[in-house]
Amino acid sequence: HIRNLKYHKEYREVFSQLYENLREQKPDYIIHCGDIAHTKTQISPEYVQMCSDFLKNLADIAPTYVILGNHDGNLRNSSRQDALTPIANALQHENLYLLRDAGETLLNGHFSLNVLSVFDEDNWVDPSDPNRINIALYHGSISNCETDLGWRMERGENDISIFNNFDYG
């Protein structure tokens, strides 16, 4: 959650460490599953700069795939623009992929990303090829899941069965 006006010095420090670690690890891909923005409808110039730098730096390291989280867009007003699309479009980075809608994206001949978008549930699809490694990307709550600290999510938006046809989720 990049806030509009707070913690930008801290974000820069943490992001700098993240970029350094990623460069050392040399990932094939970077996947971010939502909530880059803290507020979806009131965006500051400071947020735009921080988000732009964040996405550009990730995409400079490896192909970067991003889905929207509930804080990145307005679930109650689908006519409003999300907080990431204008930034991703302006960057025009060849390694930055904003996967806004539900659907399947092939990474190479072996992997498939399936976006289960909270903004596009009507268009969720199952993997098209069970021989690929199929990875579900989702940003939402799952009923009856339990954290490492023992807290249980009683009422989520979906249950764990949404991942049944995927190898990873």
Report the location of each language-model feature.
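Short, basic, glycine/proline-bearing loop/turn elements
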Residues: 2-5, 37-40, 139-149
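Core catalytic region of metal-dependent phosphoesterases/phosphodiesterases
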Residues: 3-104
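Conserved acidic residues
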Residues: 28-30, 132-134, 167
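Structural preference for beta-strand elements that scaffold enzyme active sites
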Residues: 63-65, 135-137, 168
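Contiguous mid-protein beta-loop-alpha structural module that forms a pocket-lining wall or clamp
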Residues: 163-169
